[in-house]
Amino acid sequence: MPMYLLDGKRIWVAGHKGMVGSAIIRSLASEDCEVIVADRQKLDLTRQEEVEKFLLKEKPHAVIMAAAKVGGILANDTMPADFIYQNLIMEANVIEGSFRSGVEKLLFLGSSCIYPKYAAQPIREEALLTGPLEPTNEWYAIAKIAGIKLCQAYRKQYGANFISAMPTNLYGPRDKFDLNSSHVVPALIRKAHEAKIKDLGCLSIWGSGTPTRDFLYSEDCSDALVFLLKHYSETEHINIGSGGEISIIELAHIVCRVVGFKGDIVFDTSKPDGTPRKLLSSERLVSMGWRPKTSLELGLAKSYESFVSNVADN
């Protein structure tokens, strides 16, 4: 399929105020296109009628579905109904509404948690649905898998050019730094910052510190998404990863160095670790000519700067 040109296109970014959505807006600024956004107060994505009216009125040529209810292990464990229902209903409404309103192309943003807990590493796209999920985030994962299948179903039945991309663990400006709902990177940044400010002697972290993860800066992810919107039109979902992995304990040491916390790091092994290892294979995306640009330490420094400027006193 030929390249999808963005020149003169109207592109709706759903979830534009989130970490990824806001990064997508910045990436699209260099394209000759018109970006459409809608605040939550004006458009409730869980209301099908509102979504369809918005799409029929705005008539976007392309849609990037970056809106989602997200959170870490604690949030997923305590609010399973919210995580599965809200994500299912939002993605179904946006995908169905996009089809009904004649959207030319849709990019659905998933998550690496869709893969089995013990998938062979690095995880390739074909590992989907080959084994049981990680129990600590299965509710969110099931909703995201459904989003992939919705895109594939509309393509199969109607020929819709709907694609899906699965990024690895993301971090960056506008991340969620609330300890009750955050992922590991923003949680570590907040904990290290507060430990430094309070002059604490140690920093306590969930789990053993041994699991390894693949982390990607949000600006690199948004760059990949715009690249895929232009160059990818296949049925199968495609991974977006950094190409490297790091243990949680190594990550914690880098965060402490960036933040300036000089105390000890202790691990609370009574808390769950989650999946022991998760590294995405980005071989397909790299073969198309895309690569990430931001080192982990630089990305963490930018994330901490954003946290201090916008969140630290809240």
Curated annotation (Swiss-Prot):
Site positions per UniProt: Important for catalytic activity: 111, 113
Amino acids binding substrate: 191, 206, 213, 273
Family stated for the protein in its record: Belongs to the NAD(P)-dependent epimerase/dehydratase family. Fucose synthase subfamily.
Annotated organism of origin: Sinorhizobium fredii (strain NBRC 101917 / NGR234)
Keywords: Isomerase, Multifunctional enzyme, NADP, Nodulation, Oxidoreductase, Plasmid
Role, per record: Catalyzes the two-step NADP-dependent conversion of GDP-4-dehydro-6-deoxy-D-mannose to GDP-fucose, involving an epimerase and a reductase reaction.
Active site positions: 140 (proton donor/acceptor)
Catalytic activity: GDP-beta-L-fucose + NADP(+) = GDP-4-dehydro-alpha-D-rhamnose + NADPH + H(+)
Binding sites annotated in the UniProt record for NADP(+): 15-21, 109-112, 144, 167-170, 183
Pathway involvement of the protein, from the record: Nucleotide-sugar biosynthesis; GDP-L-fucose biosynthesis via de novo pathway; GDP-L-fucose from GDP-alpha-D-mannose: step 2/2
One Gene Ontology MF term: isomerase activity
Gene Ontology terms: biological process: 'de novo' GDP-L-fucose biosynthetic process
Protein name: GDP-L-fucose synthase
EC annotation from Swiss-Prot or TrEMBL: 1.1.1.271
Keyword flag Nucleotidyltransferase: no
